[in-house]
């Protein structure tokens, strides 16, 4: 009896396995086999046939997955967009690294600009008042892009920090100016100028330095606005009590200037960050460069306009101004930490107290004091607090605040 031969079995095919976490299609046909071992784990796309749809790992959107088993990237759907996205990310990372280097070298750029302005004033005399407003406004816009509307609301809910900074602004600096002028026995015109600048509100440059020093930018903006609004009353009052001469201030002019260069750009930046985040992510790497360049140019311009007076004023007035701002930075931080304010906000208060609106002091001294040398301490102040602030920004930027242990 002949042996019965079993008919050849049909090629076995492994059925499709549906796993809740992973969809893989396997077959013994090597032409259609998917190879996954060499692909990135975080972004995986499996292409098993030219006629079958592209599958992806469950939970990972296919729009984010550009890796494939096919060795020819040009044949992978979406591969071109992936290369373009990678190129954009690469350039953005490069700009971020350059901006970080510029930010860490902030003191060097400011000091260099001041030295050049003192040596060759015409190099910085081209800066017009309108250019100053535009430069500061763009910088404030960049800082506003780091905020959200919720950040500004949170700052408004910080009465302790806001009140402490306001009180330190109008107590530490005026008293320091008065005591230093007495201690160094300054001439009357230098003493009046030193007291005048110590009674001025916080300067808009403090917001830039706070931004670079990783401080609380929203709190800085509110402190600058609050001290500026109060300057219409407190600056002439404190100056008249400590310097013996009344100084008139235009409150509406202060309000308009503050709104133009601080409040409006910051609010616009926060709105852009809230509703146009894609645009913000695109331009944000350029903002550190704009901030550093703006401060350096404005400081150089302040020195260039008063170079002859600064050179002829001697060491005494320079020393007095340096002591004034050093006391503001030091006591602003130490007293804030003493009363239990967090590190980031203490940095902000220190910068706000130590940095004054020196330009306002120059204008008031030139308009309301008979001796033009009264404006010299104010001009020196614009350089001194910028150098101090830039040094602190460089140090604090490399030391991110850690308030978790408080």
Swiss-Prot record:
Any Pfam family: SBF
Transit peptide feature, positions: 1-64
Alphabetical GO biological process terms: pantothenate import across plasma membrane
Membrane protein topology class: Multi-pass membrane protein
Gene Ontology CC terms, in alphabetical order: chloroplast inner membrane
Keywords: Chloroplast, Membrane, Plastid, Transit peptide, Transmembrane, Transmembrane helix, Transport
Similarity comment: family membership: Belongs to the bile acid:sodium symporter (BASS) (TC 2.A.28) family.
Protein task: May function as sodium-coupled metabolite transporter across the chloroplast envelope.
Entry protein name: Probable sodium/metabolite cotransporter BASS1, chloroplastic
Highest classification ranks of the organism: Eukaryota, Viridiplantae, Streptophyta, Embryophyta, Tracheophyta
